[in-house]
Amino acid sequence: MRKLTRNYINLRGHQVWSAQGKTFGKKSEPVLLMHGGLSSTESWDYTVIPAVQRTHSVFAYDRSAHGRTASREGFYHFDFQTDEAIAYIEDAIKGPTHLIGWSDGGIISLMVALKRPDLVKSIVAIGTNYHFDSGLSLVEEDPEIVISEDDAAKFALRSPDPAHMQEVIIRKAYEVWNSEPTMTIAQLSRISCPVLVLTGDDEPFSNHHTIELYEAIPNARLAIVPGTSHFVVKEKSKIVQGLIKDFYRDLDYPITIWPRLRKEQTEKLKEK
């Protein structure tokens, strides 16, 4: 697997840990990897890079209060993270990009597509819920925070924030997850780019919620990987990589033999 070049960049006054892969000529389109919540780029990028490293120019960054990027005022709310993603796309990638987002990264990808559709070529949304009321309460309102020695050591090694901020960040994440995101079916129906909804069959949210997300987006595909959880990217990396490769091979609207959801659009396309 090709390594990414990793360094800090100044993103509109904030030092953000950024990663970039090799560019493969003019036909090599950018793809931005969006990590999950309370995570970082290096904790998951190796699971998906093999799917795109020979076909795309790979970009990634640690969001504020994640990985090697310090926290700042407003961090963790999804509107804040969406605006930060838009700034990164505009300033670092400098144009429209494909997005691959896991968990919170998938949420942010959908929100970027809603707020700035001109910047999004396609989305792979992995283990993504569109609303906090997703069929299962993920966290308690006032959870007891237990930080292992290993997690504390990783935070101290990576984060520019002082040690006490680790608990502050975790509590803020739980607070946000109990009230955000709040996307609606009507909003999702406005997403026009190709979307692959990729999920485990035993996510922390309901399968019904996943189906709602898939059926709401006009140009979406659905992949449910059997025998996996929210960590589908790590549990069955090869299958996930294959699904992503297949998605990128043909981003045109899917024409199938016996469509139901796609029947009306299929008939329109066949008339042309």
Residue ranges and their predicted role:
Residues H14-R68:
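Conserved HGGG/HGGXW glycine-rich cap/lid loop of the alpha/beta-hydrolase fold
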Residues Y46, F59-H98:
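Active-site loop/oxyanion-hole signature of alpha/beta-hydrolase fold enzymes
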Residues R171-Q187, D201:
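Active-site nucleophile elbow and catalytic-triad environment of alpha/beta-hydrolase enzymes
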Residues I191, V197-T199:
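Short beta-strand/loop motif that positions the catalytic acidic residue
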